[in-house]
Structure formats: C-alpha cells, structure tokens
Amino acid sequence: PEIELTPDAAAEADLPAPAPEAIAVLDRIFWERLPAMEIGAIYQEVNPVGGPEKAKAVADSLAQTKLTMADMVYVGDSITDVQAFEAVRAGSGLAISFNGTRHAVNAAEVIVVADSAWPIAMLIAIVQLWGKEGVLEVACPETRAKSRCLVLPEAVIEPIARGLEGRLFNLYDQSAENLDQVVEESQAMRAKLRGEAVAALG
C-alpha cells in the first residue's frame, strides 16, 4: 500500500492505516530477511555518505588521480556537500551548487539554477579550455558584459547548444546582488524537479 507521510505525524503511531502495517513488513524484510540472505553481506558494507565522507571522497579521488585541489570541480546540492565545497574552495578548485538548498548556495562559489544538467556540461567545457577563471568570468555580473569571447570547439558547443535549447538556466556567483532571492530560485527549482518532500531534505 501507499505510505502517506502526513505533515502532523511525529511518530509511526500517528500514521493512518495501513501505513504502520506496511512499515512493519518493510522492517522485517530489511532487518531480518535480507541480512539472513547471501546478498545481506552487501548491506553490511554500505557506508552512508554524509558531509565528512564526501569531503574524504574528494581527497581520495585526488590521491588516486594525482591531481590537485585546484583541478577539482565539485557539484553539490545540500548541506552534506558543504564540507566538500569548503575544502575545494580552500584549495582553489571550483565549487558549484546545482539547484541547491540555502546551505549549498551559501557555501558554493558558483550557483546554477536549471531544469537540466546541460549547464553543468557547458561549465565543465569552459573549465577544460579556460580554467576556473573562465567560469567565474561568465558567472560574475560585473565581468559578464565585458568578458572575453570564450570560444569553445564546434564539436563541444554544438551538442551543448542543442541540450540547452528551450531549457531554463541561470548562473550566479557569490557577488549576486540579492543572494536570498537566488536561494529562493534555487530551492524552487529543486522542489519542482524533485518534489517538495525530497527537496526539503538538507
């Protein structure tokens, strides 16, 4: 049955029937039946990824690739990305909030509000050819009007242009005039794409 989480429910007992019964069945499956199966070993090895784990994953990635933090582009959207954002920015990498919560928007260097991931592809292409400064030049309203012509190869720009066609896409940096308005715009897009309940997480 569908499990409806009502706004006034503070505990499982507050949920309308048959939600408590369904939750009890799921509990038995996940805590009794699955651990007894061979596949249950996988669940024992799973490490939920929070803020410290994401920051550690960034460091581990750099250790494996022999790159530096300045080479890093990190895209995140919630409070669990803040520690990674801070580490990346401290090391001169690029931290991008993509339809992020208030925490993500405030911690990132560049903020993307969009209804598809194509803007991220465009920013990565700019980074590859022009570096982080190229992205900041495009994102900053003070330099956008007088910025250089950041030319991308046709093989790169054509698929990106097709992907961006008809899409909603706004780009900001921390110098945005009204950052609170940017936060609201980012969270509204997040809710539109992911649903209110999921968007409210972190």
Where do the PLM segments sit?
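C-terminal cap/substrate-recognition subdomain and adjoining C-terminal extension
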Residues: 1-202
